[in-house]
UniProtKB/Swiss-Prot annotation:
One of its GO terms (molecular function) is methionine adenosyltransferase activity. The keyword Kinase does not apply. The keyword ATP-binding applies. HAMAP family: S_AdoMet_synth2 (MF_00136). Its EC number is 2.5.1.6. Pfam families: AdoMet_Synthase (PF01941). This is S-adenosylmethionine synthase. NCBIfam families: PRK04439.1-3, PRK04439.1-5. It is an enzyme of class 2 (transferase). Keywords: ATP-binding, Magnesium, Nucleotide-binding, One-carbon metabolism, Transferase. GO terms for biological process: one-carbon metabolic process; S-adenosylmethionine biosynthetic process. Catalyzes the formation of S-adenosylmethionine from methionine and ATP. Belongs to the AdoMet synthase 2 family.
Amino acid sequence: MANIVVKKLNSTPIEELPVEIVERKGIGHPDSICDGIAEAVSVALCKMYKEKMGAVLHHNTDQVELVGGYAYPSLGGGDIVNPIYVLLSGRATTEVFDKEKCETIRLPVGTVAVNAAREYIKNTIINLDVEKDIVVDCRIGQGSVDLVGVFDRENSIPLANDTSFGVGHAPFSTTENLVLKTEQLLNSKEIKKEIPAIGEDIKVMGLREGKKITLTIAMATVDKYVNSVEEYEEIKAKAKAKVEELAKEYADGYEIEVFVNTADSDNCIFLTVSGTSAEMGDDGSVGRGNRANGLITPFRPMSMEATSGKNPINHIGKLYNILANIIANDVAKIEGVNECHVRILSQIGKPVNEPKILDIELITDEGYDVADIEPKANEIAEYWLNNIEEVREKLMTGEIKTF
């Protein structure tokens, strides 16, 4: 039986704190681009391994670096003169040795990785020409395994690759939810169709002071859709109005203040050719941005571990961060739970469904006791440990988002 501990959290609920800060780096931010590429490569490798070998082989593609290019954005349309450089590194199984046939099966890791990276960028930064404005360099380290070991591994519970931990919390606060929904709105297909000048490089910083939430939004614009400074200001105003309307739905009862591109000056505005600052010297790296729940939350417990690109089979930095958030969300739905924090610790070499400890901390509503909630919380935690394969499968197919 798993070592599950459910206890009272002696802390002020997040909504009652006088101050709260929440951040989200949008899908076009250089750090998020790296997260997205790393995860897309992992998902693509999982698919290739399953098709060719019947099992997902060892890989970690969480080492993606982006070096910013050089561009000359201009009202009405400019040019990228030096391409963005993306380095894919990490480790992956490129060879499988079949002892019975005395032959080595070679797997197209590099081709799959580069194609996955390019396809992700093409679908994410829609105004970037992936044929000429970006260079993808694959330097993923090679590894090999024995064919017999592949099938032995597929039929057993994976062992933890490290002694590490994952962290999750639920439910999202009003500020957390609003920050996440704001970026998702501005990067939605509907908004891109309505206001094509809005780029994908969007960062949302939320500050709550009592019942007032201030959103500061850095939003790239695409120069070919902006013909004058007046048009640029109109685009900002439209984006601001959209966010203010959104806030009525997700932050009813709060005073909302929205700022867009506060660094603008008379001779400097957030204008890009492609919709991302990566075109103009802004670098990126995996794990420097959003946590596994899609947010950066300094007022909550967080893991510093990068989730994207790690293998979904036994890498604790991925599995347990995702699992902790899933368990926290389910426990938070129990009647009487105000807030839930989950921490899961592994022990290297032990089965991933047998953590050293799974710690659940609860803030309860008035009139409820932790002892009343503990059985249901235990049941939820045990269910997900027993069904960890479901989480792994959803990670393999990209169904679960990691940033």
